[in-house]
Design a protein with these regions (language model features):
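Hot-dog-fold acyl-thioester-processing enzymes
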Residues: 2-88, 141, 152-164
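Short histidine-centered beta-strand/loop micro-motifs
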Residues: 61-62, 85, 97-98, 118-121
């Protein structure tokens, strides 16, 4: 079962093992994304910011910093997977193909497991395998992610302001 959503969020009860969610948004990676992420993380590998150096490698141009791609693929899935939850961790992060400036990244996630939380009766633990891919379908990242998700009856509902 595959579905594309508008990002309304899911409560624990909405996750079904085997469900594949195609996240609706894509994002084109810019040079600014790569430079900013590389600088803020103090990543001194010139493959990310030195075009002259990168031109001499097998890639021929700067590679996009992989932690940015991890954040991007995670971010593309938030509205569907963890809007009503918190991350417990990432596992088995893999980067089978490079990402370059100008690539557009899309994502999908498959629900691997869903169980009641042992320590929080008002929540459940969901594990997904997320896949990031380029505009041509090339897979650029995969990872497993565990999320603690609210059950519907316990979902925090902040009051909306009165706009009268």
């Amino acid at each position: 079962m595959t579905e594309t959503t508008g990002g309304g969020g899911r409560c624990f009860e909405d996750f079904v093992v085997g469900m594949v969610i195609r996240h609706p948004l894509g994002r084109t990676v810019t040079s600014a994304d790569n430079v900013w992420t590389t600088l803020i993380a103090v990543n001194t590998n010139p493959i990310h910011f030195d075009a002259h150096y990168a031109a001499q490698t097998e890639f021929g141009k700067p590679l996009v910093n992989s932690p940015f791609i991890l954040a991007l693929v995670t971010g593309l899935s938030v509205a569907d997977i963890s809007r009503y939850g918190v991350n417990l961790g990432w596992d088995e992060v893999r980067m089978p193909a490079p990402v370059f400036e100008g690539d557009t990244i899309y994502a999908q996630s498959e629900v691997l497991s869903a169980r009641e939380s042992k320590s929080r009766a008002h929540m459940g633990v969901v594990e997904v395998k997320s896949t990031g891919f380029k505009q041509d379908g090339t897979v650029v990242m995969t990872f497993r992610r565990s999320i603690l998700v609210y059950k519907r009856a316990h979902l925090p509902r902040p009051p909306l302001p009165d706009l009268r």
